[in-house]
């Protein structure tokens, strides 16, 4: 019991120390010296007592084990990093031979030391792993060489409906380019800015029956010739020759569907009043302009209400493609009278193949660019025209026929003059015009006004 007390007093010393490695051998040596001195001093007096109660053989292996532990601990002290086996042996020896207070203090110090070592090892491992992961990221998730406009166009063109919402564009980019999935800062704002600023992208409002949020984004039809450059990754337009080929293909496509450039151009290339329609249900002809074949519809002439007649009907009304009739013109339902031709325009346009079919409608094939030169005039029904008299239909048709050879004497066919002699005019118009058209078609090649 005294032996345990002595050891307890000796083991209280390591509380003020900083390192357990330097104190463990000293503690073991002090234990050995105290054990030897205590045994030598008490053995002569209590030899039999120790012999019966504390036999020497159990103490000798204990001292031998302590010496072995001391040797094992001295060897690791020569190496810079402490071995884990030495720490565990020291911990076991301290717990076995020390008192509760000393053992608790030593155990706390060992735990702190082990925690620091584990933390350092963990940090070193993390640094190594993060370095490897960084290399993998740099090798695998490089920034794609495409501009934001190219990414947007790529996403919209590859969508099934050729339209996407803003979130749909984000999802496409993150799905196909892991770099943007890992780095989400900044590029989404850039996508929004490019959508708003680039004219290639058009915002389409969502239909009220379509569930969801956000508008759709589509590509402008004019961006068909825009492609993504292979080296730069930016949007580029095709060359002039490629555009010409693409325009030719578009023209053929539009001709097959009936959509033409002149349909959209409207009255910009045709001098008509805005309330008259440019579309004709029988538009099937083409115009060769400057040697280039371009689709061109057969436009109804607004003066057709005066020049054409429904030969099958007896109501003396002039059926036209745009729904105008002489009855409406005479009664003053339309504020503006229709266009009328001067002599030069009449001579230039009428022999171009005006046909009066049995149905009463007509199909006019414009063949001269002079028709686009604005050789028509406007007049109001209330303006008197003293040059015209309501004599008879034969005189009017004769005057129209004579005007084809004398462009300097223009004659007009005003709507106001048709009011008194409408029945006689409509009765004799078909016969006079048919003779006139036949004569003009035969001599159209010698007419100097046709170009």
Swiss-Prot record:
Its main location: nucleus. It comes from the Eukaryota. Keywords: Developmental protein, DNA-binding, Nucleus, Proto-oncogene, Transcription, Transcription regulation. It is found in: Nucleus. InterPro entries: Fork_head_dom, FOXG1, TF_fork_head_CS_1, TF_fork_head_CS_2, WH-like_DNA-bd_sf, WH_DNA-bd_sf. Retina and brain. Residues 35-55 have a biased composition (Basic residues). Transmembrane segments: none annotated. The keyword Transport does not apply. GO terms for biological process: axon midline choice point recognition; dorsal/ventral pattern formation; inner ear morphogenesis; negative regulation of neuron differentiation; negative regulation of transcription by RNA polymerase II; neuroblast proliferation; neuron fate determination; positive regulation of cell cycle. Residues 142-233 bind DNA. Gene3D superfamilies: Winged helix-like DNA-binding domain superfamily/Winged helix DNA-binding domain (1.10.10.10). The keyword DNA-binding applies. One of its GO terms (cellular component) is nucleus. Residues 108-143 have a biased composition (Basic and acidic residues). Residues 29-80, 101-143, 389-417 are annotated as: Disordered. Residues 389-412 have a biased composition (Low complexity). One of its GO terms (molecular function) is sequence-specific double-stranded DNA binding. May determine the nasotemporal axis of the retina, and consequently specify the topographical projection of the retinal ganglion-cell axons to the tectum by controlling expression of their target genes. This is Forkhead box protein G1. The lineage of its organism: Eukaryota, Metazoa, Chordata, Craniata, Vertebrata. The gene is FOXG1.
């Amino acid at each position: 019991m005294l032996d345990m007390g002595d050891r307890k007093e000796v083991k209280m010393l390591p509380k003020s120390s900083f390192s357990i490695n330097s104190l463990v051998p000293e503690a073991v040596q002090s234990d050995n010296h105290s054990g030897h001195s205590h045994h030598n001093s008490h053995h002569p007096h209590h030899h039999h007592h120790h012999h019966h109660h504390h036999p020497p053989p159990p103490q000798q292996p204990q001292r031998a084990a302590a010496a072995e532990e001391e040797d094992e601990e001295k060897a690791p002290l020569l190496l810079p990093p402490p071995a884990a086996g030495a720490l565990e042996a020291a911990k076991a020896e301290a717990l076995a031979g020390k008192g509760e207070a000393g053992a608790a203090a030593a155990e706390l110090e060992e735990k702190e030391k082990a925690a620091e070592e584990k933390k350092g090892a963990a940090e070193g491992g993390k640094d190594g792993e993060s370095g490897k992961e960084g290399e993998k990221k740099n090798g695998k998730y490089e920034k794609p060489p495409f501009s934001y406009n190219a990414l947007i166009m790529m996403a919209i063109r590859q969508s099934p409906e050729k339209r996407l919402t803003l979130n749909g564009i984000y999802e496409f980019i993150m799905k196909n380019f892991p770099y943007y999935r890992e780095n989400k800062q900044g590029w989404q704002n850039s996508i929004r800015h490019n959508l708003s600023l680039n004219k290639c992208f058009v915002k389409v409002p969502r239909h009220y029956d379509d569930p969801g949020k956000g508008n759709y984004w589509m590509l402008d039809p004019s961006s068909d010739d825009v492609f993504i450059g292979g080296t730069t990754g930016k949007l580029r337009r095709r060359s002039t020759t490629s555009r010409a080929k693409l325009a030719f293909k578009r023209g053929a496509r539009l001709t097959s569907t009936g959509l033409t450039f002149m349909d959209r151009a409207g009255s910009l290339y045709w001098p008509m009043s805005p309330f008259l329609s440019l579309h004709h249900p029988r538009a099937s002809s083409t115009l060769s302009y400057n040697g280039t074949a371009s689709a061109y519809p057969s436009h109804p002439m607004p003066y057709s209400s005066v020049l054409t007649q429904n030969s099958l009907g007896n109501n003396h009304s002039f059926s036209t493609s745009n729904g105008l009739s002489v009855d409406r013109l005479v009664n003053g339902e339309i504020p503006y009278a229709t266009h009328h031709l001067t002599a030069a325009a009449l001579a230039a346009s009428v022999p171009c193949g005006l046909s009066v079919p049995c149905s009463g409608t007509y199909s006019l094939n414009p063949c001269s660019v002079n028709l686009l030169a604005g050789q028509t005039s406007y007049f109001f029904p209330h303006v008197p025209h003293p040059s015209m008299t309501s004599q008879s239909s034969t005189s009017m048709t004769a005057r129209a026929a004579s005007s084809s050879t004398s462009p300097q004497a223009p004659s007009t066919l005003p709507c106001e003059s048709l009011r008194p002699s409408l029945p006689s005019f409509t009765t004799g118009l078909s016969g006079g015009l048919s003779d006139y058209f036949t004569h003009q078609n035969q001599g159209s090649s010698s007419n100097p006004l046709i170009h």
